[in-house]
């Protein structure tokens, strides 16, 4: 087994080999991060209410769901690089169309296309990185990928301080950044990976196997989608200025990076469901604090930073919880099914938040999130009473995963997680069986294969 020094050297070597992919992805995230805060600000100037913006954001997440399903078909036909170029070009065009056609129906349609393109890009890059990574470097590579994604998004939102939403300049800047993302990727010397076929894991079967993970994915995706898409709408309806809004929205994204690895490591050492219950309860309390803090108070930015630090890692922990219980041969199919559940929660969030803010005022943003997180904590407490957790030594290793619908559908590529042996190739899936009476106990087949 390689030591820590060899593992670090392998990670650095691999990062240098895929620097073009990370650069292209960073440019794309900065451009889309700017677009994400630009639309609510422009919508406020155009008289588009919180309810209408909620519809637009919900349609955007519907695009994520569709993109995660249709883009792999295009990948099989023409390959990763061509599909990436097509998606980035289409996404760049969509930003400019939003600047010209300022109506709720047109924004909904165009933002649906943007969601489809974003989901496709995530599928491409994550499968590419997983194909290049090894057992020893995968966690570090995906962690670096997550930092680039969150950092790019926060950087794009902060760019809003350079201009205003009432002109074309910021729309053009967003479009240019997304277009530039094509350059390093198309010139990359990295070999495009193949996309393997996946097994089936119906949502009903996954729910019967590990209901806590399915319900948790829906709830935490609701909260994460609200925090990423409706935070700017909360800022505009609360009377914040553009500068304050950019700080408020980017604070949650920055916070998302801070506790991903520490909370994941904690859930590896202790019963995962108990850790998730604690994180959900703390997040609920932070949402209540946010609801009680006046929007004019600068401390609300700090509250949102800590809130993001606890909320966003929940998605990855629920993914790990699902992997604790499903058979090794269904890891990839489970990932796709979790995307479906995640998309349902993500699409419901903007609609619900938009309606509650229009009906009860801006503070309903945090109150709604507090209710959702409180219900999640209560459900986890109930599940703890009816089903014993898996022993800590049999839990799968946590991997940093961003809470974004569409990003995980094919992210594990040809690799799956075995709870005892770690990451291994899908070619070896037939070598492991599951004792259906005890889903947490993985056994060797009786035919003597090894």
Where are these regions (language model features)?
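Intrinsic disorder in cytosolic terminal tails and internal cytosolic loops
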Residues: 1-13, 193-201, 383-450
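Helix-to-loop junctions at the C-terminal end of transmembrane segments
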Residues: 67-79, 164, 259-271, 357-358
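Structural signature of the two symmetry-related core transmembrane helices
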Residues: 82-96, 175, 274-288, 370
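Cytoplasmic helix-loop-helix junction between adjacent transmembrane helices
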Residues: 112-147
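Intracellular juxtamembrane helix-capping segments at the cytosolic ends
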Residues: 120-133, 312-326
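C-terminal membrane-cytosol helix-exit motif in multi-pass small-molecule transporters
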Residues: 160-161, 175-195, 376-384
């Amino acid at each position: 087994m390689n030591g820590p020094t060899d593992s670090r050297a392998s990670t650095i070597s691999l990062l240098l080999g895929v620097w073009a992919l990370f650069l292209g992805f960073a440019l794309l995230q900065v451009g889309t991060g700017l677009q994400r805060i630009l639309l609510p600000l422009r919508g406020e100037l155009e008289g588009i209410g919180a309810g209408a913006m909620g519809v637009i954001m919900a349609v955007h997440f519907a695009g994520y769901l569709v993109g995660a399903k249709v883009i792999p078909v295009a990948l099989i036909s023409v390959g990763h690089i061509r599909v990436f170029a097509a998606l980035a070009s289409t996404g760049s065009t969509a930003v400019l169309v939003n600047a010209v056609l300022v109506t709720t129906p047109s924004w909904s349609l165009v933002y649906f296309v943007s969601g489809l393109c974003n989901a496709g890009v995530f599928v491409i890059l994550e499968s590419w990185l997983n194909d290049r990574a090894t057992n020893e470097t995968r966690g570090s590579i995906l962690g670096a990928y997550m930092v680039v994604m969150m950092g790019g998004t926060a950087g794009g939102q902060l760019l809003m301080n350079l201009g205003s939403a009432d002109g074309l300049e910021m729309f053009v800047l967003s479009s240019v950044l997304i277009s530039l993302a094509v350059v390093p990727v198309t010139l990359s010397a990295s070999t495009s990976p193949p996309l393997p076929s996946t097994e089936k894991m119906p949502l009903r079967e996954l729910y019967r196997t590990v209901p806590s993970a399915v319900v948790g994915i829906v709830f935490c995706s609701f909260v994460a989608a609200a925090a990423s898409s409706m935070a700017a709408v909360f800022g505009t309806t609360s009377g914040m200025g553009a500068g304050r809004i950019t700080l408020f929205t980017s604070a949650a994204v920055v916070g998302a990076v801070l506790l991903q690895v520490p909370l994941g490591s904690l859930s590896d050492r202790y019963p995962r469901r108990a850790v998730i219950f604690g994180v959900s309860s703390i997040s609920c309390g932070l949402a209540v604090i946010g609801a009680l803090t006046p929007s004019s108070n600068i401390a609300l930015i700090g509250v949102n930073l800590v809130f993001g630090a606890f909320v966003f890692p929940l998605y990855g922990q629920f993914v790990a919880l699902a992997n604790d219980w499903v058979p090794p041969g269904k890891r990839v199919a489970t990932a796709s099914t979790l995307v479906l559940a995640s998309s349902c929660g993500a699409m419901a969030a903007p609609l619900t938040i938009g309606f509650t803010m229009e009906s009860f005022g801006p503070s309903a943003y945090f109150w709604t999130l507090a209710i959702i997180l409180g219900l999640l904590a209560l459900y986890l407490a109930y599940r703890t009473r009816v089903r014993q957790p898996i022993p800590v030594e049999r839990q799968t290793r946590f991997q940093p995963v961003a809470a974004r619908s569409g990003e995980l559908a094919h992210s594990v590529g040809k690799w799956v997680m075995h709870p005892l042996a770690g990451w291994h190739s899908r070619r070896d899936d037939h070598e492991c069986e599951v004792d259906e009476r005890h889903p947490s106990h993985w056994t060797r087949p009786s035919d003597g294969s090894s």
